[in-house]
Amino acid sequence: MTSRATANLPLREATDFGDRQFGAALVNVTNICNLSCSHCFVFRADNPNRPKDKMDDATMLAQLRALRDRHGIRSMLFMGGEPMIRKKLVLEAIELFENGSIVTNGTYGIPSVPGHLVTVSLDGPEPLNDAIRGQGVFQKVRESVFARDPGDGTIVMLQMTITKQNAPGIEEFVETVKDWPITGVAFTFYVPSHDEHGTLAWDDLRERDPVVRRVIAMKEKYPRLVKSTVGALEMMFSDRCLQFTGEHGENCLMRNMLP
């Protein structure tokens, strides 16, 4: 929403990233979120709900258009915070790109964006998910998923971020959601801060290898439901994952995206 104070201000120029072409990019449309998930990298670094300068809708849309045209961006990932707090902006912005993706916690409903992807974060069966994301969140997300029109053309994925805390629930999670009106399920692994020790991360990546094997087993059992590929999952094994990321993320493919 544009306030009266900013309505007549000139639009700011988009950041100059040079002449490099980027096929994909991501944008955090807000740092604000209605949840406080224990594994969230935003909450680890800061309080995202603290008032800060916010780019108004008109400026953000103008900058997204400029960056798209300048860098040849075809795919845009909309993140937060919780991006659906700025639903009007996101629904308008996603149509600027050939391929759009929204990552949401699902508590504001599932947006209808035919031809685009909506990834809904859900971190295990109800008790394990709610221990991470907050009491009642699992049921809110379930209600949102079942309230949507499954024939509207929106690609809807559930994504479980696997931690040491919720790893015991992988199989139960898949069995619980396998008949939901979704396109599929994806798995990612929690990325700890440097030298982090606690209940979420494995101190030794070799301890995580049995969990990777369990996810691969779910892929083999439900090949159409679980969208993570076996090849991608095998990259998570301790004897090869650092080859693809580097010790400090220097080899990460995300570096090829415009941030």
Residue ranges and their predicted role:
Residues 1-112:
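Conserved alpha-helical substructure of the radical SAM core
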